[in-house]
């Protein structure tokens, strides 16, 4: 079976490569790639990790002009109304209010030498966070029930964030006394996130942008690419059988935005912060890497500053850091703003992306969206609304864990739309989710929607209301705050004697590494590669595998770079 699967996967890859080559030749005869018809020629997207709106901007106290009416308005945040609190399961008479400041990284050691845990954000966790809990007559905790197949999601009051953080989402009725319940309610002071705050005040802050799924990273990031998760409602699993998802990556009935762009002769690029970008989990992406659609983020500034840069759609993947380290902590050392990493690294990434575009020759024709995939378990006070189901098929039945119908949005996340065509200090109260990005791109570039979700989604077009580009947008942003974090404060220097099992999200990133490795593996060795991957159970095994794949990918990249340099040098000599 493994041999047949591997062989069929190899055949599909060859046909995909051949189709891409034919398409390139057709484009060369038909004048190459198209240029978008409207004033926006370039859409840039930066999606960070696991932070709620209130957690990042809840105390920013932003006033401005309503994007729809032009009237004075205020962001829906923690500085108005209230109380904004959650009940404490261990002290029902003492609710915990949202407060500031937050810690720069949850991996920072506390006074007792321990680390706060990473907040839960799987489907069960979010169900509890949004719907809260009750107690029966014997004072036993009663958790919310799963939505039925008809997707009748329970009533939402955003009251279960502390309960989830203290362990109730384990569904064992046990309330932990070891977790500081206030951690999940703490939000950043504007001085801690000066880059994000400056952009929110300078351009358009969207205070009703919700994650597309009340769940974790993987399905939410898929919605950015496909307006669907193909039925995935939790972190992936099911890698113990030779499924199509394992060997080829995830697929979607109606394809992705990249298929739509290519079908209309629009170019696109993904700039990746490390060797294992999440988008590689999508079928065909590892092959598209060979077609020149993927570049390292280190090349971003040079590419965008080229006067000939003509890519209409750019998606930026952050560095996710030490996803599978040999220490007990994960996600440290990146710039994705994962809760276990130093948030100022992500602030620095946002600053770099903005300043590169702002000072490039293409600024006047650009739109940049900075947002987050999901809330990461952190408190937000706004109840997410219902929405349209994508209406496509479930592509991987083994990954539809809860029978979820995708008619309920997830927790609110920060979103800032940035362009010289957007008036300064705009506040947008329009309801959005991640498929709104695709609806906007489809509107700007004349593309058809992918699913019912993006067909029904609100677009960002109305924000681009200026007839001529602004000239007062800052050319530089404030420096990120000083977190005071050094390497040994986030657990990177302490070796762990534990070799625990992989979490669902760790296995998902491991799968991305496998897909990269699998594409480079000769056909006769593919069955053995599959078996080796399926035998990985513990962090040490996964860490060794990913380090080896990283080494191979880095070596291959250096070889390609050397060849390019050699060609440029020889071309110069011929000239």
Whereabouts are the PLM-identified features?
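N-terminal pro-sequences and low-complexity stem/linker regions of secreted or lumenal proteins
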Residues: 2, 8-575
